[in-house]
Structures are given as structure tokens and as C-alpha cells.
Swiss-Prot record:
Annotated protein name in UniProt: YcgL domain-containing protein CGSHiEE_04830
InterPro entries given in the database record: YcgL-like_sf, YcgL_dom
Highest taxon of source: Bacteria
Species annotation: Haemophilus influenzae (strain PittEE)
Residues of the YcgL domain: 1-85
Amino acid sequence: MLCAIYKSKKKLGSYLYVANREDFSLVPSVLLEHFGKPELVMMFNLLGRKALYNVDCNEVLETIKRQGFYLQIAKQDDGLFNSLSEIK
């Protein structure tokens, strides 16, 4: 499965993974407001041989299937995205 990976200009180290390029329809609008305008980093094959940095491909794949997107945040997060479950 190919996915599109976007980085946040507002939040250093935050990445948003979606199944289809430029399709943010399943991402909550509040999350997108905090994330800022997504900047495409790359298209990535989650079922391929290459690994992602700091995140498991299977976890990303399952989360995208379940909720339509995957949010990767920096380990030193200041709490901006910690309440993702409340945003939904």
C-alpha cells in the first residue's frame, strides 16, 4: 500500500500519513489547523522492504486502515497533539 507522507511546517518533527495524496478528508479539521498546511515529503510503500524512521510500517498501515490517517509526532512534543482522541 502506498501512502503519502506530509510534514508540518508548524510543528517540527510531526508527520501526517494518508492513504491518498492530497486527500485529507478523514483527518479532523482541528488537527489540520494545528498541523498547518501539510508539505508533501514523499510517497512510501508500507508493504515494501524499506523501513520508516522511528515508526513501524505495520502500525502505520493498520492505523490508516482503521482511522484514515496516522500522525507521527516528535518525542519531545509539547502537548499540542497529545489530546488527539479528544479532537475526534
